Amino acid sequence: MIDTRLPLTDIHRHLDGNIRAQTILDLGRQFNLSLPAATLESLIPHVQVTANEPDLVSFLSKLDWGVKVLASLDACRRVAFENIEDAARNGLHYVELRFSPGYMAMTHNLPVEGVVEAVIEGVREGCKAFNVQARLIGIMSRTFGESACLQELEGLLAHRDHITAVDLAGDELGFPGSLFLSHFNRARDAGWHITVHAGEAAGPESIWQAIRELGAERIGHGVKAVEDRALMDFLAEQRIGIESCLTSNIQTSTVASLVQHPLKTFLEHGVLATLNTDDPAVQGVDIIHEYNVAAPQAGLSREQIRQAQINGLEIAFLTPSEKQALRELVAG
């Protein structure tokens, strides 16, 4: 279902949610860390979703082993590099990798700014090696509170020229966007784009807040937007993109089934909705699965899938000239 004449993008992809099981095993051994299993086969159930989780917080716990083995800055550089290698293997032309430097740093008390630098370096090396274009989105992990998010913001600002956008992710219900107004004021002052996880665990009001108070240009997941007709109209009229992640929303029990997923409704309503992975290694999926398996099961027609692919570049955090250059590159 992928149109090979168009750029293939993944603009909602967590770098720290895409740490290979083999890499977790390798780093665990390298740093003599205690892992829940000693072989790759027995480790996978601990680091990958094998059945739908009851909620988002339970799903997020599957990510923890990936960051628990990041005992050095070089380990952070390695997983960033491997993220680009994975993107190339999936046939992606352009990827936006988002990461929470505080989350990656916390287990082994790494310097947050150093983690940011290591990720930048790994991505740069990967793009050069595998001929993939990438941009970085810094995440503030709301779950850890306002002060921790401020630390993340400071670490990202130290390398502001290498960061394209900032995001707010984590426990949406427990830590609403209203707690982070000053953080986003500074992010906008830095000239960054804004995307926010909203309407995943909380309702449409969380999406409104992300747009009106935090300045969101795009919304991560946003599945609850369908509950508010005025919001749907606003998203379409203002060209505020939705970063849809089909399989992820089922695995987190955010949506009961693919048939009930709102992506088809978004596209029918003229919302610039897209197809993305979210946390590929944890989910056990890739972008090809989302296009060829998940999207048809969600009721999307071939033309709607193509439109979602077009939208992926349309709402990417690239300049118009960069988008056109990518179109021409793929068209040959």
From Swiss-Prot:
Q: Record's InterPro entries?
A: A_deaminase, A_deaminase_dom, Ado/ade_deaminase, Metal_Hydrolase
Q: Which GO terms describe its molecular function?
A: 2'-deoxyadenosine deaminase activity; adenosine deaminase activity; zinc ion binding
Q: Where is this site: Important for catalytic activity?
A: 221
Q: Which GO terms describe its cellular component?
A: cytosol
**Between which residues do disulfide bridges form?**
none
Q: Which cofactor does it need?
A: Zn(2+)
Q: What is its EC number?
A: 3.5.4.4
Query: What superkingdom does the record give?
Result: Bacteria
Q: Which GO terms describe its biological process?
A: adenosine catabolic process; hypoxanthine salvage; inosine biosynthetic process; nucleotide metabolic process; purine ribonucleoside monophosphate biosynthetic process
Family annotation (CDD domains)? ADA
Which catalytic residues are annotated? 200 (proton donor)
Cofactor descriptive note: Binds 1 zinc ion per subunit.
Top-rank EC class of the record's enzyme? hydrolase
- Which reactions appear under catalytic activity for this entry? adenosine + H2O + H(+) = inosine + NH4(+); 2'-deoxyadenosine + H2O + H(+) = 2'-deoxyinosine + NH4(+)
Which residues hold Zn(2+)? 12, 14, 197, 278
* Pfam families, A to Z: A_deaminase
Q: Where are the transmembrane segments?
A: none
Name the keywords, alphabetized.
Hydrolase, Metal-binding, Nucleotide metabolism, Zinc
Where is substrate bound in this sequence?
Answer: 14, 16, 170, 279
Q: What does this protein do?
A: Catalyzes the hydrolytic deamination of adenosine and 2-deoxyadenosine.
Tell me the protein family, please: Belongs to the metallo-dependent hydrolases superfamily. Adenosine and AMP deaminases family. Adenosine deaminase subfamily.
Checking HAMAP family in the record gives: A_deaminase
What name goes with this protein?
A: Adenosine deaminase
Organism of origin: Enterobacter sp. (strain 638)
Upper lineage: Bacteria, Pseudomonadati, Pseudomonadota, Gammaproteobacteria, Enterobacterales
